[in-house]
Amino acid sequence: MQEHLVVTLDGKDYLVEPGTNLLEFIKSQDTFVPSICYNESMGPIQTCDTCTVEIDGKIERSCSTVIDRPMTVNTVNNDVKDAQKEALDRILEKHMLYCTVCDYNNGDCEIHNTMDAWGLQHQTYEYKEKPYEKDYGPFYRYDPNQCILCGRCVEACQDIEVNETIRIDWDREHPRVIWDNDVPINESSCVSCGQCATVCPCNAMMEVNMEGNAGYMTDTEPGSLAAMIDLTKKAEPGYGPLFAISDSEAEMRKERIKKTKTVCTYCGVGCSFEVWTKDREILKVQPSHDSPANKIATCVKGKFSWGHINSDQRLTKPLVRKNGEFHEVEWDEALNVIADNFTAIKEKHGPDALSFISSSKATNEESYLMQKLARQVIGTNNVDNCSRYCQAPATKGLFRTVGHGGDSGSIEDLEKAAMSVLIGTNTAEAHPVIASRMKRAQKLFGQKIHVFDIRKHEMAERADRFYQPKPGTDLAWLSAVTKYIIDHDLHDKAFIDEWVDDFDEYYKSLETFTMAFAEEATGIPESELIKFAEECAKAESVVICWAMGITQQDIGSDSSTAISNLLLVTGNYRRPGTGAYPLRGHNNVQGCSDMGSMPDKITGYQSIEADDIRAKFEKEYGVKLNPKAGKDNHEMVEGIHDGEVHSLYLYGEDTGIVDSNINFVQAAFEKLDFMVVQDEFLTFTATYADVVLPASPSLEKDGTFTNTERRIQRLYQALEPLGDSKPDWKIFQAIANRLGFDWNYKHPSEIMDEVARLTPLYAGVSYDRLEGFNSLQWPVQPDGTDEPILYLEGFNFDNGKAKLFPLSFDNYFKQDEIYDIHVNNGRLLEHFHEGNMTYQTPMIKYKVPRAFVEISPELAEDRGIHEGAEVKLISETGEAVLQVHVTDRVKGKEIYIPLNNDAMENGDLGAINLLTNSDVDQYTDTPSYKRTSCRLEVITKRGKSPLNPNNFRVNKKRQPQYSVQVQKKWERSDYVFPGNQVDK
């Protein structure tokens, strides 16, 4: 087999691998060829024609040429230069050069840079204004008069994000980008991911925050300076002086526009990007091809929802309650109050009378210090985090079967899989960038997507097959499918023999899991389950993703175990494109648990009850550690009611809204002797506190986050803390020192060094190795070697073998006669969790102003209600009043309530957890949020819709197509390929 081909480039021979993109090869040799429509994250689009070169004597586009034979390539002869100039002239016919007064003149305008690098001095075709106005959406705007029709935005929308909203109407006299069937941006199905603005090579598609703000002389139009620009063009011998002026102005901008690499503070995907700031103003968020988790993709929150950073509701001074009212105080007083109360409670009731809840929004280093504060300084293991509310059952299931509590591969593997199975995950709204990778794999590469969910969300709509089991019955069909695969000799016997223990015992436990049993339990027809089982067994590679629809059940641990059992039986571990993916909900919920903010585990999931583990930490900490596992979140609340817990310190967590059965939780808060809350805002939970400490968000500190794929990434401080707020790690250090300890960390890197010394899972992690966009996926060996795919050398048990885990099922779903409606709940794309951060961005709030309840058309008809009706939902634990959105995303007596009730403005009004109960998964104490029933009372029969009429949910209008459909451009009567004009 031929390994390399000879390519002669401008007279010099090179050995090149077959399949290499010619344009990429030319660039790799530091040879300049213009390529305005090409983007390395998207590949060839073929609209601009600027990348023409001569290949074996013929002028062709280099961007779409694959090196599949020996070639002679010329980039410099006259014919090539003439063809390139013709293409560049056509671009300037569509785009006015007013660089010095353009907000996009920041050194990265690809039109400016290309014209300058090519040496263009004059344009042949005069710029022609088009008969269109600018179109403004909430977050970005489109200027048709600057658009060169490169189609990058279309490619991004159609084939990268796969939101399928944007296209080019090539049939017009003056083609332009349109949204849906030619409606304004704000009336379209656009989900505001912002990737169109990210990839635009010029100022045609641009973030609203950039407009009029980026340059020294910019305004929203060229304005009065346009005449000067035209005069300069005519007076100067070429464009060189004009570019020199704009380059100087762009260089000046660097003095006031700061570009800082950070990691998104919302979901668990772990998107990284540069945030552009001018003073405290956030101009834009710019992802990079080097971003390891997301590449150039973002969602509306990561790209645009940064209003919380400069919100006027930010806490800037400590608050201490005096005579029932909060008063601003200096840090010294607040720290004294905390130290005095912690000391008094510990002396009176013992260390286990104090409890600590860590934040999945904070950094790894801060989570580590929170548990260190609890264990070293106070002497208790009463420390936990919000993985208790969502992901603990998934971790339990994976610990049982494969030994590591994390995704078994990378996000890339989700794209490589032949089959993706989504169970109880609203991926397109909870993890939108991951969903885009899977939608792309399905659309372009034939991946099969199977969705099991009680709600018809976007991924269910797009699925090759969609199954709607009864609530909480996934374990039944998972085990029945596994049994069928084994019974019909479809299991991977070789894989099981080499890599899996306990097969015989496990197989016996499957005896009752017949397909008939599964159909009765789940309501999914036996024939559909059989077909799924056969496809799953025969697929070359399978990944299974799951989230809160599985974990937030009273059998969440067992259902998660059943998922891993199925993957083991089919041999879908230890290979690219396979494995288990419990999609983590928060930006650092994985890392928070990794750092030991758990009652029974210290860093890296080392048992606090193990003598050798405690001895290691005791040597580092200089104190004896409590050998008894502490209380988890659920047990803390119970302990408060039982008089065992007297103090609670929590940060970055609105527990009084997000815990289940919040009437019970709030009643517990009122019983506490002393409560400390640390947050950006005076949250609903903070209103119960005795001391509230002002904390700094992610843009105001350094640190690391660990995402859902176990990827550890650095974030860099972009802004100074607002007012007297402080990073959480500095606050913990101040409290520890006020209590008599001598913590002396100067920078979070020192904290991570300590973690690495104590934690085999993070042994080789250091800030040097995480510089810039570099990342590591744990476990990380001391030499820095990481594991993007787990278990290649064996599973995380002593003998290297996985374990099949026997299960049973008696969790039939039965609807209560009185509480006859099943309440489902979860996230929305625009908001995160309770919405404390996202509601601070006005345009996010404009898109989704309040929480609501989704009701099926059949239930609405049965109760005689319509869109906008107001209803009261009543469960055994509480009641909530919400407005109705009628939609076929839910069916029958299933309803869906988003989590975002804007608690800072509305308190607990409309909060889903007024309805949830205190039932939990028996192995992890994770609340059974998804196992809630209620009855419905009608307050008003109709009203104003709770959704903005322009919200994409109201009227889906997607316009799917493949890429930019450049052939329609080529078919136009006014188009001639530039190469044809110079070919002889």
From Swiss-Prot:
UniProt cross-references to Gene3D superfamilies, sorted A to Z: 2.40.40.20, 3.10.20.740, 3.30.70.20, 3.40.50.740, ADC-like domains, Dimethylsulfoxide Reductase, domain 2
Binding site for [4Fe-4S] cluster 1: 95, 99, 102, 109
Pfam families: Fer2_4, Fer4_7, Molybdop_Fe4S4, Molybdopterin, Molydop_binding, NADH-G_4Fe-4S_3
Residues that, per the record, bind [4Fe-4S] cluster 2: 147, 150, 153, 200
Binding site for [2Fe-2S] cluster: 37, 48, 51, 63
All copies of domain 4Fe-4S His(Cys)3-ligated-type, residue ranges: 79-119
SMART domains: Molybdop_Fe4S4, NADH-G_4Fe-4S_3
InterPro entries: 2Fe-2S_ferredoxin-like_sf (IPR036010), 2Fe-2S_ferredoxin-type (IPR001041), 4Fe4S_Fe-S-bd (IPR017896), 4Fe4S_Fe_S_CS (IPR017900), Asp_de-COase-like_dom_sf (IPR009010), Formate_Dh-H_N (IPR041924), Formate_DH_asu (IPR006478), MoPterin_dinucl-bd_dom (IPR006657)
Catalysed reactions, as listed in the record: formate + NAD(+) = CO2 + NADH
GO molecular function, one term: NADH dehydrogenase activity
Cofactor note: Binds 1 [2Fe-2S] cluster.
A GO biological process held by the record: formate metabolic process
Record EC number: 1.17.1.9
Residues of the 4Fe-4S ferredoxin-type domain: 138-165, 181-211
Keyword NADP attributed: no
Residue span(s) of domain 2Fe-2S ferredoxin-type: 3-79
Cofactors: [2Fe-2S] cluster; [4Fe-4S] cluster; Mo-bis(molybdopterin guanine dinucleotide)
Binding, [4Fe-4S] cluster 4: 264, 267, 271, 299
Annotated segments matching region Formate dehydrogenase: 252-984
GO cellular component assignments: membrane
Domain 4Fe-4S Mo/W bis-MGD-type intervals: 257-313
Residues that bind [4Fe-4S] cluster 3: 157, 190, 193, 196
Entries under PANTHER family matching the protein: FORMATE DEHYDROGENASE H, RESPIRATORY NITRATE REDUCTASE
Family per record: In the C-terminal section; belongs to the prokaryotic molybdopterin-containing oxidoreductase family.
Annotated protein name in UniProt: Putative formate dehydrogenase SAUSA300_2258
